[in-house]
Design a protein with these regions (language model features):
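Active-site-proximal alpha-helical scaffold in enzymes
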Residues: 95-125, 168, 174-203, 263-270, ...
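Flexible glycine-/small-residue-enriched beta->alpha junction loops
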Residues: 118-172
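Condensing-enzyme catalytic core mediating Claisen C-C bond formation in acyl metabolism
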Residues: 2-35, 233-298, 302, 367-368, ...
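Active-site pocket-lining segment
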Residues: 168-171, 204-207, 284-353
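Conserved catalytic cysteine-centered active-site region
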Residues: 64-119, 161-165, 230-256, 337-364, ...
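N-terminal extracellular/periplasmic Venus flytrap/periplasmic-binding protein-like
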Residues: 20-21, 32-41, 49, 183-274, ...
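Short, well-ordered amphipathic alpha-helical segments that serve as non-catalytic structural scaffolds
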Residues: 36-51, 74-78, 103-106, 166-173, ...
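Conserved beta-ketoacyl condensing-enzyme motif
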Residues: 31-98, 102-118, 123-142, 208-222, ...
């Protein structure tokens, strides 16, 4: 691709590597692997895949939501552990589920403005390791019981405006958009079936960085998404509502609580050509959207429309979509609102099957999109996701 870039294309920002860990289940294989270690392993592999040296990197921007207990600036920790010189900068971004999408937008902007030429962006999240918090201890708990707060739910999955779980927002969307339980379960089943088919066909192997995990029996190599489950419509139908007594959102038609890391390396196109780097795609542009927090799941439809307007495209120009499946209800709502062909959306399954490590999920869907575009020769792709609090983000990428 890079050898064909001429004129204005040389000012574009291109992707030169896209890697991720396999996604771990809650308290699963990655529970003892810290976000720092996960991110470092994947970053090193991404650098190797790109052909870049650590010294070529100008800055590092990583999304992370559950930062309590991780120490100062997880992005800086991963940068130095990966061998990137200490005279380069790094910072972390928290925009809840949109953390990576904001990170890659900032990385893109830094290159377009000429501040940097090579920027590492990505997301890291170990939801299994999120600590419990006590707000009673700072001032001294003289007597009585102390309340412990689950930081994973409090900081990652709880609507701060309505004081309820993200799952309630999905039930709100289902009710507002007239999406039945049967539709949601059918969508969830398809996600599981597509993900299992992709795994069996080895489609994720190239994008996944194996992680070695030491245990009592020795060293285990974790290299396959472990969250996908065998299920049927009948078994999904037996699940009770998870959030509202009369709701339709269940554990089976929602995304999981997961662990993982993903890294994407961006480069100025002219720099990539000078270094002889292979490129996966060019970043065409971004879109943001916002809505009422209680129906946050519809925001990808707003973000995608804004994205397409920004890049002067229409929906028919997009060959492939990766939409983060926070919940089946909101995913279906977005599909209906945009009138998308389901055959070009999440062709290898989505977060309901693969998992949703919140700060890393935007990167995971873009990594998967880029590799599917490469494999299937799709020219234009779009990745988007909703964000707790009533926001959405989107990115369009193009192969040339």
């Amino acid at each position: 691709m890079i050898n064909q870039l001429k004129g204005k294309d040389m000012n574009e920002v291109v992707v030169v590597a896209a890697k991720r860990s396999a996604v771990g289940s809650f308290l699963g294989s990655l529970k003892s692997v810290g976000a720092r270690e996960m991110g470092t392993v994947v970053l090193k592999d991404a650098l190797k895949a790109s052909g870049l040296e650590p010294s070529d990197v100008d800055s590092v921007i990583l999304g992370n939501v559950l930062s309590a207990g991780l120490g100062q600036n997880i992005a800086r920790q991963i940068q130095l552990d990966a061998g990137i010189p200490n005279d380069r900068n790094a910072f972390s971004v928290n925009m809840v589920c949109g953390s990576f999408m904001k990170a890659i937008q900032l990385a893109h902007d830094a290159i377009m403005l000429g501040r940097d030429e090579v920027v590492v962006c990505g997301g890291v999240e170990n939801m299994s390791a999120a600590p419990y918090l006590s707000f009673d201890m700072r001032d001294g708990k003289r007597m009585g019981n102390a309340n412990m707060i689950d930081s994973m739910i409090h900081d990652g999955l709880w609507d701060a405006f309505n004081d309820y779980h993200m799952g309630i927002t999905a039930d709100n969307v289902a009710q507002a958009c007239h999406i039945s339980r049967e539709e949601q379960d059918a969508f969830a089943l398809q996600s599981q079936l597509k993900a299992r088919a992709a795994i069996n066909a080895g489609k994720f192997q190239e994008e996944i960085t194996p992680i070695e995990i030491a245990n009592k029996k020795g060293v285990v190599v974790f290299k396959e998404d472990e969250y996908p489950r065998e299920t049927t419509l009948e078994s999904l139908a037996k699940l009770k509502p998870a959030f509202k007594k009369d709701g339709s959102v269940t554990a089976g038609n929602s995304s999981g609580i997961n662990d993982g890391a993903s890294i994407i390396i961006l480069c100025n196109a002219q720099k990539a050509q000078k270094l002889g780097l292979k490129t996966m795609a060019a970043i065409k542009g971004f879109g943001l959207g916002a809505c009422s927090p209680d129906i946050m799941g519809i925001c990808p439809s707003i973000a995608i429309r804004n994205n397409l307007k920004n890049v002067k495209m229409n929906l028919n120009d997009i060959n492939l979509f990766e939409l983060n499946e926070a919940f089946a209800a909101q995913s279906i709502a977005v599909l209906k609102e945009l009138e998308l062909n389901p055959n070009i959306v999440n062709v290898n399954g989505g977060a309901i099957a693969i998992g949703h490590p919140i700060g890393a999920s935007g990167a995971r869907i873009l990594v998967t999109l880029l590799h599917e575009m490469k494999r299937s020769a799709y020219s234009v792709g779009c990745a988007s996701l909703c964000v707790g609090g009533g926001q959405g983000l989107s990115v369009v990428v193009e192969q040339k």
